Curated annotation (Swiss-Prot):
Stretches the record annotates as Disordered: 264-306
Compositional bias per record (Basic and acidic residues), positions renumbered to this chain: 264-275
Assigned GO CC terms: activin A complex; enzyme activator complex; extracellular region; extracellular space; inhibin A complex; perinuclear region of cytoplasm
Single Gene Ontology BP annotation: positive regulation of erythrocyte differentiation
InterPro entries: Cystine-knot_cytokine (IPR029034), Inhibin_betaA (IPR000491), TGF-b_C (IPR001839), TGF-b_propeptide (IPR001111), TGF-beta-rel (IPR015615), TGFb_CS (IPR017948)
CDD domains for this protein: TGF_beta_INHBA
Function: Inhibins/activins are involved in regulating a number of diverse functions such as hypothalamic and pituitary hormone secretion, gonadal hormone secretion, germ cell development and maturation, erythroid differentiation, insulin secretion, nerve cell survival, embryonic axial development or bone growth, depending on their subunit composition.
Quaternary data: Dimeric, linked by one or more disulfide bonds. Inhibin A is a dimer of alpha/INHA and beta-A/INHBA. Activin A is a homodimer of beta-A/INHBA. Activin AB is a dimer of beta-A/INHBA and beta-B/INHBB. Interacts with FST and FSTL3; these interactions prevent activin A interaction to its type II receptor. Activin A interacts with ACVR2A. Activin A interacts with BMPR2. Inhibin A interacts with ACVR1; this interaction creates a non-signaling complex (NSC) that inhibits ACVR1-mediated BMP signaling. Inhibin A interacts with ACVR2A.
Glycan-bearing residues: 165
Pfam families, per the entry: TGF_beta (PF00019), TGFb_propeptide (PF00688)
Protein species of origin: Rattus norvegicus
Protein known as: Inhibin beta A chain
Amino acid sequence: MPLLWLRGFLLASCWIIVRSSPTPGSEGHGAAPDCPSCALATLPKDGPNSQPEMVEAVKKHILNMLHLKKRPDVTQPVPKAALLNAIRKLHVGKVGENGYVEIEDDIGRRAEMNELMEQTSEIITFAESGTARKTLHFEISKEGSDLSVVERAEVWLFLKVPKANRTRTKVTIRLFQQQKHPQGSLDMGDEAEEMGLKGERSELLLSEKVVDARKSTWHIFPVSSSIQRLLDQGKSSLDVRIACEQCQESGASLVLLGKKKKKEVDGDGKKKDGSDGGLEEEKEQSHRPFLMLQARQSEDHPHRRRRRGLECDGKVNICCKKQFFVSFKDIGWNDWIIAPSGYHANYCEGECPSHIAGTSGSSLSFHSTVINHYRMRGHSPFANLKSCCVPTKLRPMSMLYYDDGQNIIKKDIQNMIVEECGCS
């Protein structure tokens, strides 16, 4: 019974979402919605006045996104020499050889970085005891099995210095990767440093750092290239030997693994936990070495491939992106808009047959797939609903312009340009 109730609730929720969403053509031409694609798609494309109507829709949309009721009145424009000098000094744009201003696309780069960060996983792996003394073993989580591009990898080690013996001595800490090679295939390359080869084992210097031994603190050792090499070879474990030759004479020591809890025996012969030992163990464990890995899937990974939206070429009727560029010079707006030179007012148009509704890659694919499942089977209230061709990916746009007070404004506008279209 609870399962049936849950299904009914989800069904009703989807129906409410669809009923509350505007359908193409439900908005008046005079409105300036936040979605320029929706406004342009409802306008006639073939009539004699179609182009002016579309340009007017774009104008209203730009003013709306800049929170302006009308275009600024630039009666006394700033001299071009002063304008170009200010732009150079403030680093808000670049001036080309032809005198045109190219705005710095900081927001576009930030959007790309944010998208990249969303695809990046961060994995922290704590060290285990290695097979030999002063060696550490790191086993990279299975979470990283699909990750093949290393953005950053670091080994963190804690250097402990006794309070009574703090000198100004500097010590050198080295990390060596222990490697196993098949018999007769030992080829370390130019960057390898062999130290005490024994049979099939060899060592490669991973990282080296000179640190101050005056205080107890963490030290970071970059190992990105080594982890990248491991992933390229299909491996997931790293064995590291730690060397610090001057540590003993300076009184410093590296915390490689937490000490095991000591057991004390009471008068009755029973074992009891030593409170001091427990605190010491907890402190040691808090300084346990770890590997921090930031990695992502490669561009050609099958899980990263998603269906790209179609570009309208006049040959297909299926939902696609229609390119539409409005030059600010052509519409007489280049006197108050400094940069860019125009606006890519792309919009979505085309049919959405049932077999492509809710395609992967669409931000609306969950709801559209559920609704389409019931619609195709004639279930009420979805039987008469139709899929719509809507933007599925938008990108931001930066603008540099004058306001009514001749001030230069730079504004970053989110979701301004349609990049891809899909069926809802």
